[in-house]
Amino acid sequence: VPYTALPFATAISIQHQVPLILRRKEKKEYGTKKMVEGIFHPGQTCLIVEDVVTTGSSVAETALSLQEEGLLVQDAVVLVNRGQGAERALSQKNIRLHSVLTLPYILQELLSEKLITQQIADETKAFIQTHQSP
């Protein structure tokens, strides 16, 4: 997903010795002029890597771009899932979302370390519940 998760995706690529491809935000007028950059072949499976998801729309847009190039997209991994409906939205597009951390978990850890108050944790949870994606 352009471009915030690039360091995370690069680390995964290096650690697991798998190719890295990148979806651009917009097509450049120079170079390859492609939206999807990297070495790949139609029919290959691709894992989407994202830093934070809220609604899942960025992951869905990336999946569509990759599918248009002939790649198979079944899974996405995210560093932080805010818990606002991305998992549900992506499952409707047959994409499994795997979260390293969830916002409720982060809140609980911050609370247990006394880095936030119960009031802040409760207000944040209430905000998440009232601001779910459709």
Where are these regions (language model features)?
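PRPP-dependent phosphoribosyltransferase catalytic core
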Residues: L64-P134
